[in-house]
Amino acid sequence: MSGREQTGEKLSDSEYIEEEPRRSRIGNLKKKAFSCSTKLTHPLKMRKGKRKIDFQIPLIEDVRDEKEEKLVSKLRQQLLQKDLLPPVHDDYHMLLRFLKTMEFKIEKTVTAWEEMLKWRKEFGTDRIIQDFNFKELDEVTRHYPQGYHGVDKDGRPIYIERLGKAHPGKLMEVTTIERYLKYHVQEFERTLQEKLPACSVAAKRRVTTTTTILDVEGLGMKNFTPTAANLLATIAKVDCNYYPETLHRMFIVNAGIGFRSFLWPAAQKLLDPMTIAKIQVLEPRSLSKLLEAIDSSQLPEFLGGLCKCPNEGGCLRSNKGPWNDPEIVELVHHMEVNNVPQTTTAPLHVRDYDSTTCTISPKETLKEEPEPEEYYSSTGSRSSMHTCIVPPLSDKASTSDGDKFITTVESIESAQSQLLDADTENTFANTSVREGGQILRFGALREKINSENIFHLVKILLVFPLKLFVLFGFLLPGYWQRQNTVVVPDSSTNNKVLECFDRLKKMEKEFTEISRKQVKIPEANEKLLAESLERIKSLELDLDKTKSVLHITLTKQLQITEQLESQDEERRKGCCF
């Protein structure tokens, strides 16, 4: 027992009655502060005991054009009126891709959107990731090497195909066009639902497009068959109609003289100028240009990089990328579970914050004049102790794929200060708690927060003219870029591609018929040939007769010679006697 208990020192009844509510209030406030402080753990601070993982959604920056936002908003309203906008497809960037394909004509876009929804329902696209199992994937990739591997310097996923090593005939022996098309759509859905969000989290900015590398080394007539033509036509139709504007750039590497002289000029006639501008053809000795856009650690060795994936199948089967990082996958899943809203009508230079998802640092202590606690993330950027789920909104004009971003630190800090104000009012009920249990009034804290808001307001007013100048600097080039990059309607491009495939089919049929026909010589030539053969035979007979006569003559000559020699010898013997 303590000394106070031994001496019998106790509080009086009145002191005990006054002390009991005070203790209960302190206990409640301690519980609130403890429960609130354990929501977020600092990523770089070591804690004793078992580590509690709490997923913190990073700030993903996104810049949008004001005119494009208005058009997307109009399109969204029309789709909602016609009940053509399911929540799963209510995405700003998806709507913008269809608008760009249809030259920002809303009526055509609504028609294309309706066709897309109808196709997804008939094809079962919404459930294809869960329902479809492509068992023959290993054999297919053996006859048609392809796959995702790494990201470029802007954080976009890289898709690689080795067309020169594709064997369409062997490919159709292990699968069918229908099953391969389902696999193609399944991979597209995985890219949109898993790979692009993971790349956005890793790059901390919105990623909506991909980078493609086509290796045409060894490409020849063996790769152009009717089966390959049908497969390419089907895939091109799906990509153009239902997944438009997903390509950022394409590199065609190891292009020989034949490809650059014949195939590429013919292909350019079927492509619009904007698509041609996205494609870069590289010679075998120009592979080093890939390193300007892609880090060497993200490139396979056969493309001039340093990556040697040890798994079976090499780099193309490794599926290397941020989408395989468990922490990033959990973050993406956490964003989907929290159902982060997509804002389409918010003005520029404004970001909406979801205050219900804010979390507080575990070691946050409030004093009479508290200073806002800050820490540095693993990438070196400074963050506030309050981290919120931030839906991407626009700040300045963007490029065609929305991947160039401009940070608005002042507006973010101002919003975070307002969140701190609201969170403190709701949580601490005009009181603040220190570790020692001392109770302080909320007035000092509120006064400090108001002074910080005034400081941020003055900061914004001072920086606003500079931002306005920068805005005009980005707006004018972006306007001319959008004016010069007009997308050719999808239907005409698709028709041209189909016409080209039809011509290719006709040529292949004619070639097959010609190869099957037996070679026939004209009758006149056959007669001449027969007469020549008869003459040759008669000459051969005459030659044989001549040879026999000559042989007989030679034998007679030898006999005569022998007779003459014998007569000479007899004469010589007679003379001697």
Curated annotation (Swiss-Prot):
A Pfam family of this chain = CRAL_TRIO
Q: Where in the cell is it found?
A: Golgi apparatus membrane; Cell membrane
Residues annotated as signal peptide: none
Q: Which UniProt keywords apply?
A: Cell membrane, Coiled coil, Golgi apparatus, Membrane, Protein transport, Transport
Annotated ranges, domain CRAL-TRIO: 136-311
User: Mainly resides where?
Assistant: Golgi
Q: Which CDD domains match?
A: SEC14
Cellular component (GO) terms are: Golgi membrane; plasma membrane
Q: Which GO terms describe its biological process?
A: protein transport
Domain of life, source organism: Eukaryota
The protein's matches in SMART domains, at most eight in alphabetical order, are given as:
SEC14
Q: Please give the residue ranges the record annotates as the region Disordered.
A: 1-22, 364-383
What is the membrane topology listed in the Swiss-Prot or TrEMBL record? Peripheral membrane protein
- UniProt keyword 4Fe-4S, yes or no: no
List where this protein forms a coiled coil.
Answer: 523-550
| Family designation | Belongs to the SFH family.
Q: What's this chain's function?
A: Required for transport of secretory proteins from the Golgi complex. Catalyzes the transfer of phosphatidylinositol and phosphatidylcholine between membranes in vitro.
Indicate what this protein is called per its UniProt record.
Phosphatidylinositol/phosphatidylcholine transfer protein SFH14
**Organism, scientific name:** Arabidopsis thaliana
